[in-house]
């Protein structure tokens, strides 16, 4: 994904959250979202712990299967079978490299951190804070 990159920022509940546009796709900073829940030095741990969860892997795998024709399903199945074990660890970088995932993006350097497509970022937000749940459709009457 080394192409045209542009960053902007939005404020969510008084917390600045970076949005990186890569090849005309917006990726929201999971790192910034995690910093809102914990101290800056532990944001990466929050993301890694979220990635370890079986429900997270199932969501990510389903998203990638739907939107990424180059997703490596066999590698995904391996991660899914390991999820839940005490010895299972997974970083965003490892997920991307092993499965050819496009929904998560890792950036080193000045705007470094872990970024995700808005669908994935909203899922992450709801996992770390119920007040960050996003309703993407208008509320329907009962």
Briefly describe each language-model feature range:
Residues 1-46:
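N-terminal intrinsically disordered, low-complexity, charged/polar
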Residues 4, 57-111:
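Long, intrinsically disordered, low-complexity Ser/Thr/Pro-rich regulatory/activation regions
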Residues 18-22, 107-112, 121-123:
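Conserved phosphate-binding loops in nucleotide/dinucleotide-binding enzymes
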Residues 31-34, 125, 136:
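Non-transmembrane alpha-helical segments in soluble domains
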Residues 37-61:
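Compact nucleic-acid interaction/catalytic patches
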Residues 116, 121-131:
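Conserved pre-motif C helix in the palm subdomain of viral-like polymerases
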Residues 133-142:
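Single conserved hydrophobic/aromatic residue that forms the stacking wall/gate
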